[in-house]
């Protein structure tokens, strides 16, 4: 991070110029401008590398991020030219001409949609662009095949429909060019280069001043800096803005945990069976078969020693070498017919196997820190043959976040309405004390019509659950009758409670069961959420994972019920994590409570009622924040 000589007045002048010129439709409040000014001051004068900002719903986090990025870009461009901002006529400098500067990272589709709308609304296409996951982009040649009803059987269509019955096109996931890049891609698919929706979006985002990416996409492109094909599009930028940043530690750790299954071995084994029918086996294919048996053994039993993981990674790399030799032998005999039939398939498998080089490197380094190793084996009960899935985690999570995320950031702005103790958050990120500073924005919402009721309906801890759950579910049903003409959410905390409530409702003839929307998968949840938003029926969305990424303003949600305090389920991994980060368990629960309450009351004059049923809420709710505590009322539901 480069430090510049700059005055407070220069920052103020640059900020004023940006706000005046960026878009006439952006009209920030004085409070918002003061926030941006203070962030800039902490970066350029106080020389902090990271700013942690707790800003509640409705405080304009997106606009704060946009104005900060463009002002930062403007200041740096002028300072790189050696200019004193107080001594020049800023009207002669076009702030929209400056180069690549920042990333704006989001956690979910709701935020991406909001930013997409802001880009259109504020006419920011020349300085800001969004790139989504590849499944959101159409592959034109694959879609042509998908829509070819004369092709029987249409295997591509069958694959896509099986995964998504409502699919209208073939996404980039199913692209024909999957194993091609560079000059080979141009020769094989010349017509795709300039019209591919995904590649066009990627190209635009790669040279735009502010690129909007989701966390997973950004983390994946940052993890392969040695790949020139990736680096030419995305590299470390001056600014990285993280929205909903409270999710960042879990997102990073979940992405970089190693989960090993035998899926790739099954694919290879199936292809070998096909090859045998067409070409018969040769000596090399028999060697591959024998080596496969060795690899499969890794999944027949739980892991007892971490060295088994390293050995398996080595075995997979050896498998790749054997497959390469096998293909050479088949190609020499079949005069390229083998390559034509199976080349693309094996190229894909080789890419998967190549990942084991990184796995082996990471696992070898982790083995040097035995105190940080955690592994578990989950029995797969979906098959007649007993086999296991193996999960390996690094217990030093702050180190994982630091290495794979923080070290890829030049200057970082972390924003969320749910940061709680910001020093704890900084510790989870692996930040040093002298690297970061903290800021807090109070809510400007009017909560006078939005009480949060502590109903003290019974304890749902382990010892009291069975004796109280039926009574609490009855209370839940009675509350829904009080809001029979209003939409709402019921947070069940677990699928067990979810199913118990579902059964309770189905057996109650006084209830219109069709009003309650239950889901089993993320896709179902998103579909039901869309139905709920678009319908006038007073639906109630019910589930254990409705804390994040849901925007239900006004009549879309007038009440919420939280049945149980959302503590994480205690297992061996959670116990280990609690030993390492004693504050994490309670912090994780508080985050979920605050996020859940925030699904309604989406703007200053919005209102809703919140019902907390589990008596354990009384023990933790006072550790949330002042806005929530100020809304609390005790109310027995009889």
What are these regions (language model features)?
Residues 2-16, 74-211, 216-219, 283-287, ...:
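A substrate-engagement module of RecA-like helicase motors
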């Amino acid at each position: 991070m480069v430090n510049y000589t700059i005055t407070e007045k220069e920052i103020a002048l640059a900020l004023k110029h940006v706000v005046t010129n960026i878009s006439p439709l952006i009209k920030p409040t004085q409070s918002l401008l003061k926030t941006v000014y203070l962030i800039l001051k902490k970066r350029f004068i106080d020389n902090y590398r990271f700013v942690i900002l707790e800003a509640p719903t409705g405080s304009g986090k997106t606009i704060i991020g946009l104005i900060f990025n463009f002002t930062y870009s403007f200041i740096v461009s002028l300072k790189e030219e050696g200019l004193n901002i107080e001594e020049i006529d800023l009207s002669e400098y076009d702030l929209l001409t400056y180069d690549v500067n920042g990333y704006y990272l989001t956690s979910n589709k709701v935020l991406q949609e909001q930013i997409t709308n802001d880009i259109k609304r504020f006419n920011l296409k020349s300085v800001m662009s969004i790139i989504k996951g590849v499944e959101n982009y159409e592959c034109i040649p694959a879609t042509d095949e998908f829509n070819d009803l004369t092709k029987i059987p249409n295997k591509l269509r069958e694959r896509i429909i099986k995964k998504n019955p409502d699919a209208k096109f073939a996404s980039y996931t199913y692209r024909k060019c999957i194993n091609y890049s560079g000059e080979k891609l141009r020769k094989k698919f010349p017509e795709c280069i300039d019209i591919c929706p995904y590649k066009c979006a990627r190209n635009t985002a790669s040279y735009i001043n502010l690129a909007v990416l989701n966390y997973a996409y950004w983390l994946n492109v940052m993890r392969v800096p040695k790949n020139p094909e990736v680096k030419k599009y995305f590299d470390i930028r001056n600014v990285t803005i993280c929205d909903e940043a409270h999710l960042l530690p879990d997102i990073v750790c979940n992405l970089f945990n190693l989960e090993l299954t035998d899926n790739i071995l099954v694919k290879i084994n199936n292809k070998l069976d096909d090859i045998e029918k067409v070409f018969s086996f040769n000596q090399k294919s028999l060697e591959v078969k024998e080596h496969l048996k060795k690899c499969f053994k890794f999944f027949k039993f739980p892991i007892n020693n971490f060295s088994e993981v390293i050995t398996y990674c080595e075995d997979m790399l050896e498998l790749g070498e054997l497959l390469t030799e096998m293909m050479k032998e088949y190609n020499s005999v079949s005069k390229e017919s083998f390559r034509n039939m199976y080349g693309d398939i094996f190229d894909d498998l080789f890419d998967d196997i190549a990942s084991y080089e990184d796995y082996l490197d990471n696992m070898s380094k982790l083995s040097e820190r035995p105190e940080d190793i955690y592994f578990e084996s989950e029995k797969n009960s979906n098959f007649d043959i007993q086999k296991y899935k193996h999960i390996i985690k690094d217990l030093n999570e702050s180190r994982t976040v630091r290495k794979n995320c923080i070290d890829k950031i030049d200057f970082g702005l972390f924003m969320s309405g749910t940061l709680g103790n910001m020093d704890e958050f900084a510790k989870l990120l692996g930040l040093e004390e002298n690297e970061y500073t903290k800021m807090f924005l109070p809510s400007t919402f009017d909560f006078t019509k939005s009480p949060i009721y502590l109903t003290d309906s019974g304890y749902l801890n382990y010892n009291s659950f069975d004796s109280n759950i039926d009574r609490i579910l009855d209370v839940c049903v009675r509350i829904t009758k009080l809001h029979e003409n209003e939409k709402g959410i019921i947070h069940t905390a677990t699928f067990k409670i979810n199913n118990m409530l579902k059964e309770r409702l189905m057996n109650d003839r006084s209830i219109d069961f069709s009003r309650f929307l239950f889901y089993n998968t993320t896709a179902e949840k998103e579909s039901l959420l869309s139905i709920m938003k678009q319908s006038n029926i007073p639906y109630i969305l019910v589930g254990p994972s409705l804390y994040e990424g849901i925007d239900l303003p006004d009549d879309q949600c007038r009440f919420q019920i939280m049945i149980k305090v959302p503590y994480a389920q205690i297992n061996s991994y959670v116990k280990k994590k609690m030993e390492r980060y004693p504050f994490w368990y309670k912090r994780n629960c508080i985050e979920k409570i605050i996020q859940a309450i925030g699904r309604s009351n989406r703007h200053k004059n919005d209102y809703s009622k919140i019902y907390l049923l589990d008596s354990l809420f009384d023990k933790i709710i006072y550790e949330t924040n002042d806005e929530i505590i100020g809304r609390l009322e005790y109310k027995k539901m009889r």
